[in-house]
């Protein structure tokens, strides 16, 4: 029973608690579909997602690793002859900059239901 509780506790830990620095990498693109590839970050880097905007155009996005001191900054980037204002949003944890998926939501729901089944029923 104790082993079961320990396993559930480990599964319930947020992804950022494992200390692994793997992130999704995606070149600057005007497509919101950024499947990307996996990359390993340095010890002083965090995962990031960059969102760029320019007047009269659609947004651009990129993902990867970034020095933690550069997180949250806004910088100009050029894409297809247009200069965008790119703002980076950083996160910590393994692959934290990937797009949320229905599998993540389903896993959280399954974990909650599993915990509920392990608890003894209350007597009224």
From Swiss-Prot:
Keywords: Cell adhesion, Cell membrane, Cytoplasmic vesicle, Disulfide bond, Glycoprotein, GPI-anchor, Lipoprotein, Membrane, Signal. Residues 23-97 form the UPAR/Ly6 domain. It comes from the Eukaryota. Disulfide bonds join 23-47, 26-34, 41-65, 71-90, 91-96. It is a lipid-anchor; GPI-anchor. Residues 1-19 form the signal peptide. Gene3D superfamilies: CD59. A lipid is attached at residue 97 (GPI-anchor amidated asparagine). One of its GO terms (cellular component) is outer acrosomal membrane. The keyword Signal applies. Testis specific. Expressed in spermatozoa. Residues 98-124 form a propeptide. It is found in: Cell membrane; Cytoplasmic vesicle, Secretory vesicle, Acrosome; Cytoplasmic vesicle, Secretory vesicle, Acrosome inner membrane; Cytoplasmic vesicle, Secretory vesicle, Acrosome outer membrane. InterPro entries: LY6_UPA_recep-like, Snake_toxin-like_sf, SPACA4/Bouncer. One of its GO terms (biological process) is cell adhesion. Belongs to the SPACA4/bouncer family. Sperm surface membrane protein that is essential for effective sperm-zona pellucida binding and penetration during fertilization. This is Sperm acrosome membrane-associated protein 4. It comes from Homo sapiens (Human). The gene is SPACA4.
């Amino acid at each position: 029973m104790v082993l079961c509780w320990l396993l559930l506790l480990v599964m319930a830990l947020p992804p950022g608690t494992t200390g692994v620095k793997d992130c999704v990498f995606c070149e600057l693109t005007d497509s919101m579909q950024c499947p990307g590839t996996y990359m390993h970050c340095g010890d002083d880097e965090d995962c990031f997602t960059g969102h760029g905007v320019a007047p009269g155009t659609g947004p651009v996005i990129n993902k990867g690793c970034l020095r933690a001191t550069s997180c949250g900054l806004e910088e100009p980037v050029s894409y297809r002859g247009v200069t965008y204002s790119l703002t980076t949003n950083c996160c910590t944890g393994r692959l934290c900059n990937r797009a949320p998926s229905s599998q993540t939501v389903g896993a959280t729901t399954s974990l909650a239901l599993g915990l509920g089944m392990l608890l003894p029923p209350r007597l009224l």
